[in-house]
């Protein structure tokens, strides 16, 4: 954990795919933004830092194990977190779930008082853990995560149910057990039942609000 005197406070939210990380992050962002203003709080998804695969064919891209730490460009993410803490803006990559690679365009992200960083593999990398002021692990049963993932990937990402199930059995579940679940030990706060745990969200809001004082 980093010293809280840093200009930009980084809060990490990790957990299984479809565990409710994004819902918690978006709820915290929306409700805190109403209190402090958009210029003081932001959200960065770890998914933006999937490695560029534009040099690979589509057939090769779909074979990538997206639940393994090697799929992430954590070195670039680390550089960006450190830049934000120095007060510098970053060019956030844009990742396409349809094309399975980064887009050419980027999004400028200005430093904020608080940045909420959310993703499945955040706590697996000691370098990233060292940049977090505190971390959260969203602990949701895998069967619930699977049902949510099927609904999300079919409806929002253009996937077939068969491909989602095959990926879950081949990589998602094994990688969760090998990398993601063990990283729970590094979390400062564990949130059960995902993004609908209102008590947990209120506790997190109170904690984060301290950084705006």
From Swiss-Prot:
Its EC number(s): 2.7.1.48
What is its EC class? transferase
- State the pathway, as annotated in the record: Pyrimidine metabolism; CTP biosynthesis via salvage pathway; CTP from cytidine: step 1/3; Pyrimidine metabolism; UMP biosynthesis via salvage pathway; UMP from uridine: step 1/1
A GO MF term: ATP binding
User: What are the annotated GO cellular component locations?
Assistant: cytoplasm; cytosol
Q: Which UniProt keywords apply?
A: ATP-binding, Cytoplasm, Kinase, Nucleotide-binding, Transferase
Q: Where in the cell is it found?
A: Cytoplasm
Record's superkingdom? Bacteria
Tell whether Secreted is among the UniProt keywords.
Answer: no
What GO biological process terms does the UniProt entry carry, in alphabetical order?
CTP salvage; UMP salvage
Gene3D superfamilies according to UniProt: P-loop containing nucleotide triphosphate hydrolases
- Give the reactions, separated by semicolons, that this protein catalyses: uridine + ATP = UMP + ADP + H(+); cytidine + ATP = CMP + ADP + H(+)
Provide the binding site for ATP: 15-22
Main localization, broad class:
cytoplasm
Q: Which family does the similarity line name?
A: Belongs to the uridine kinase family.
| SUBUNIT field | Homotetramer.
Recorded hits in PANTHER family, A to Z, give: URIDINE KINASE
The protein, known as: Uridine kinase
Which species is this UniProt entry from? Escherichia coli (strain K12)
């Amino acid at each position: 954990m980093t010293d809280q005197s840093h200009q930009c406070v980084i809060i990490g939210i990790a957990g299984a795919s479809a565990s409710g990380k994004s819902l918690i992050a978006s709820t915290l962002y929306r409700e805190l933004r109403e209190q402090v203003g958009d210029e003081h709080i932001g959200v960065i998804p770890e998914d933006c830092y999937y490695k560029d695969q534009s040099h690979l064919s589509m057939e090769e891209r779909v074979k990538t194990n997206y639940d393994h730490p090697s799929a992430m460009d954590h070195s670039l993410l680390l550089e960006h977190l450190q830049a934000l803490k120095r007060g510098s803006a970053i060019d956030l990559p844009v990742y396409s779930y349809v094309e399975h690679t980064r887009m050419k365009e980027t999004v400028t992200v200005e430093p904020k008082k608080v940045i909420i960083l959310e993703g499945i593999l955040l706590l697996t990398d000691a370098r990233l853990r060292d940049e977090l002021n505190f971390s959260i692990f969203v602990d949701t049963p895998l069967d619930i995560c699977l049902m949510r993932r099927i609904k999300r990937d079919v409806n929002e990402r253009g996937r077939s149910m068969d491909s989602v199930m095959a990926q879950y059995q081949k990589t998602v579940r094994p990688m969760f057990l090998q990398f993601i679940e063990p990283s729970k030990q590094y979390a400062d706060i564990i949130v059960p039942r995902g993004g609908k745990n209102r008590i947990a969200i209120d506790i997190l809001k109170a904690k984060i609000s301290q950084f705006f004082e």
